[in-house]
Amino acid sequence: MRDRVFDFGVRIVFALGVFAILVTAILIRPPKWLSDFDQSFYLTIAYDLNHHGVFSNGVFDKVNSTATVPPPGMFFGPVYPWLIVAATKADARFAQAVDCSVQATNNQVESAGCDAYARPMHIMHAAFLTLGVLAIAAAAETIFTSGAVFWLAGILATLALIPDADLFSFVMTESVTFSLYSVAALALVLALRTPRISRVLIVGLLFGLLCLTRPSFLVLAPVVVGLIVLNGVWLLRARWRTVLSHSLAFALAWLIIIGPWLVRNAVSVGKWALTEEYGSAALIERFAFDDMNAQEFVLAFPYCLPGIGEPVVNWAFGQQAMARFVYYTPESFFHIGRSHRDKLVEAHGRLDPLIKGLIRDEMAERWWRYLLVSLPLAWCGMWVGGWAGLALVPLFGCACVMAVRRSKPLFLLYAAPSVVMLGLHAAVANHYTRYNLILIGPFAAGAAWVVAEIASAASRRRRAAQNSGS
């Protein structure tokens, strides 16, 4: 009993240490204007909720919500804007900063007079990230039944997050999606290891909440059902009735979470859907990458290696060789895709009615380019964690091989959803690692296991040598 209390206390201290490291890394970043990057997407919706009680499409509305009530929208999921609203209720200074930023975006005030203040969100981000790290560590410990792996995985996950501290200092969704996914993946591991209806229900609730944070996670619903079936039928040899009941329990819990949002969208917007225009906009921007030339295709593989790839390629081939991969350059794939999207919106008003025709035309003319280009995009998106990624990615590969050889299928099931999302982002989005931070979980867990096994083997050899010498 005393050992358990001590272990719990040590883990609490570890959690506080992780939080202290992450919150410090975020808070020491230079202050950001709240109109920078994609922050206005969510801040405008929060503003509309605060001042009009309307969940809108934010900056994608055609009305100035500082002057008139915006129409209801469903472009973004509701979780993150509501978190911003909660932060504005808790901190009046942040509320004033949000209002000023939105008013400046709509040219109602000068942006120079707005306060670059988002501390409550920064603290919230650090708390979410810490929860995600603990979930990764717990999942690794559960999969490999090793206390050492818990500590190693937690440390590696923290190290992998620090390079993105600047990203987390923006008022955007990355920290929340990372956290919710990591917790959902832990719940999935527990449910697959010891299947029970109650555990599967929790998995469904968490993955449903994830969809309300970022709609692209909708694709994981059938993936998780597939994993439940695969685990039950192939690994546990459970009866089909049991497997079916667990699959239905997941689906029911998932629908309980997203159902109210679907009903709200049907009543307020007139559409039975989770989102509108979101997927169409992303895919239209993704099609711009299909113009990638042969040199860009080949150089993408060394170029995307964190820390070393970009300077080496720029030195050997010049900065213009991969300039289209850098989103802020005028001729980047990002700007070309965004410009095409904006022109379509200007000409037609909406993208969803056009997307089937655009997909048909793209696949008819350049399907082979689309498939080939997805390879470097997935490769580039895979290298999460900055410099740490140079170690985490190969160690993850080793862990996958070891998992097959040593019958650790639970690790492969744990990794599968994040790998599916990597492929999805390469197919319908872009190559930026910010969308694939959920890979840190399986990467850190796998790397921790490999390191622990190497250390254990070295310790055994050392003891054997000492025994033989004596």
Q: Model segments located where?
A:
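Transmembrane-helix signature of polytopic, membrane-embedded enzymes
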Residues: A95-D115, V133-A160, F178-S179, R193-S198, ...
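Membrane-interface transmembrane helices that cradle and orient dolichyl/undecaprenyl
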Residues: F144, A184-I202, L210, L230-W234, ...
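Membrane-interface anchor segments at the N-terminal boundary of transmembrane helices
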Residues: D115-A127, K343-A415
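Membrane-proximal stem/loop segments at transmembrane-domain junctions that anchor or position
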Residues: L274-Y370
